Amino acid sequence: MNNLTLSLHRERRLLVLLGLVCLALLAGALYLQYVKNEDPCPLCIIQRYFFVLIAVFAFIGAGMASGAGIAVIEALIVLSAAAGVGTAARHLYVQLNPGFSCGFDALQPVVDSLPPAHWLPGVFKVAGLCETVYPPIFGILLPGWALIAFALIVVPVAASLLRHRGRLR
């Protein structure tokens, strides 16, 4: 095996790991929803969509054989995670500024009208308000943890893209 083959093999394994981590984060959100009775708000659901999108892209990328294909998938992962950073930051802002609303009435119908909300309402249906603050985990609010997770996805995947930018040729 040459270095490029080894690099692609390692990259694909890391993409599988990333997909599994995103699914584990979604499982954690469902645990909080159903066991701890912490209802998801519109911004929570949007963050779930981004974690699912990242997982889907990661699993697709793990099945690709070409470096250029993996690079395109990694770019989609970076875009999804960056959008997740923005959503989580907005959610954190809403929770840290009492009296400020996420626009529950405006966002809920939009989020609830998306097809996955009809296919899997237990996962993607809005049931709470964005300004509801649930007990922090290790001193960090839930949107803060989502922000950290999305940032920890953006940075290494973007670094991988930059490190392997020759694959696009």
From Swiss-Prot:
The keyword Transmembrane helix applies. NCBIfam families: PRK02110.1 (NF002552). It is a multi-pass membrane protein. Residues 32-49, 90-144 are periplasmic. Belongs to the DsbB family. GO terms for molecular function: electron transfer activity; protein-disulfide reductase activity. Gene3D superfamilies: DsbB-like (1.20.1550.10). The gene is dsbB. It comes from Burkholderia thailandensis (strain ATCC 700388 / DSM 13276 / CCUG 48851 / CIP 106301 / E264). One of its GO terms (cellular component) is plasma membrane. It is found in: Cell inner membrane. Disulfide bonds join C41-C44, C102-C130. GO terms for biological process: protein folding. Its main location: membrane. Residues 1-14, 65-71, 164-169 are cytoplasmic. SUPFAM superfamilies: DsbB-like. This is Disulfide bond formation protein B.
